[in-house]
């Protein structure tokens, strides 16, 4: 702890108190204390950052039964079903107490082991079981307002910006409303915007020309690999395999997301909830499916 952290906590509590009073709590400060108390316990369940960067420790494939067992008395099975994951047999979780073999393989000393024991997912599930319900209610109310502040009344948006924008990030003022509105649309239905953008500014003949150029570059690179003297046969084979697996993505995707099942109206908050619901269901639809290498992780615009 230091003076800076004390100041930040005070500012954070002030923001929470204001938001929770807006949400209907008579004593915003008392409700804010409940949120901070819960978040402190959640933080204690997190692993030490340095140890948590060890990939050998953070890839843990477990069965549904094993995950449920980690929760003890907490209804983990109901949580899994509530997330729409009831048909999944296996899960990959990042943080679970390492086995004796993993401790030895990764050379964890006693201090490091203490930082990853009893916490992680099992620790979080324990907090979910033991923390008072009124803490969870205040926590969820506050974070719903924080997470959706950009589509809520200006008083809420300004309160959130005052802490996250000014106090934490040192920003003097919010970006213009229209710019944030554009970001909201792009983050919600970005490929629909991208389709219009591509039609206007990157016609099909331009894409065809660039596709041909990239294909020629790939051919030239492949021929160059065959003649490189300093590269061994095994390394060449690996390089050629990597080149053959490369999927060029020029201009815009071959097929755009249509957002067929997304319904929006004139209510900004309701639209945000609809987008979140659509995005989550879309993510679930990919489970167990082959990787779609034509899908883009960026927007044309």
Predicted regions and their residues:
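Amphipathic alpha-helical coiled-coil segments
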Residues: 227, 250-257
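Active-site-adjacent "gating/activation" loops or surface patches in catalytic cores
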Residues: 97, 105, 112-119, 137-145, ...
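Short amphipathic alpha-helical coiled-coil/interface segments
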Residues: 16, 32-42, 210-221, 225, ...
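Long, compositionally biased
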Residues: 50-68, 259-281
